[in-house]
């Protein structure tokens, strides 16, 4: 089983001529939020990331800690690294998202062997969050 679904999702670099790192910086917080909104099994991982990596204060409400982790990551990317956090900041629209979702899933209906399974529709929705 692979956990590289985030890298599979990162189609911005080939579709819009962005660097892979910038694409991942825009994508990762949205991917995390998308998963957290739909799959409570990610709460512990994302909360642990928040505490251990982003310096979020640990408390009993792990879901709140997980959301704080995502916010802290997005703020770090924008404020500390000075990178855009939305595709619209780069003048990018959604005109290529349909093709990107197919490429992200390697032409299949979904990425079942990902950290968490993602369908093409999931990929499309995450891309929309990046606008």
In which residue ranges do the predicted regions lie?
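Glycine-rich phosphate/pyrophosphate-binding beta-alpha loops
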Residues: 1-24, 108-110
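Short acidic alpha-helix initiation/capping motifs at coil-to-helix transition points
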Residues: 3-4, 74-82, 100-106
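Gly/Pro-rich interdomain helix-loop hinge
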Residues: 12-96
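Short, amphipathic C-terminal "tail helix"
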Residues: 93-131
